């Protein structure tokens, strides 16, 4: 899985978000290491929708937009399973690095 797909799914794991909120959450969680530019973000969301990992949903009740109608996205059960599998795969890599004493336990 592409790293930005994993980060997008992680951002959606707890609650529905619009594009800018996804971008901000990923940027903050990665300490600025990953910047999702609009083309990258919306291209990924379009493909992830086709794959069945996310769906577009309505804005939460009471959401105040500064204009326009932001698109909100929700992770699907399939998206959650795929994200969890990727997390397990990455955790195995971290465990291997720890066993080689490249990381502290």
Task: Show which residues each predicted segment covers.
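Residue-level recognition of specific faces of alpha-helices
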Residues: 8, 32, 44, 71-72, ...
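Basic, amphipathic "hinge/linker" alpha-helix immediately C-terminal to the N-terminal HTH DNA-binding motif
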Residues: 64-84
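Amphipathic alpha-helical dimerization/coiled-coil segments
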Residues: 78-105
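Beta-hairpin "wing" of winged helix-turn-helix
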Residues: 49-66, 74
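Basic amphipathic alpha-helical segments that dock to polyanions
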Residues: 41-48
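N-terminal helix-turn-helix DNA-binding core of bacterial DNA-binding proteins
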Residues: 1-40
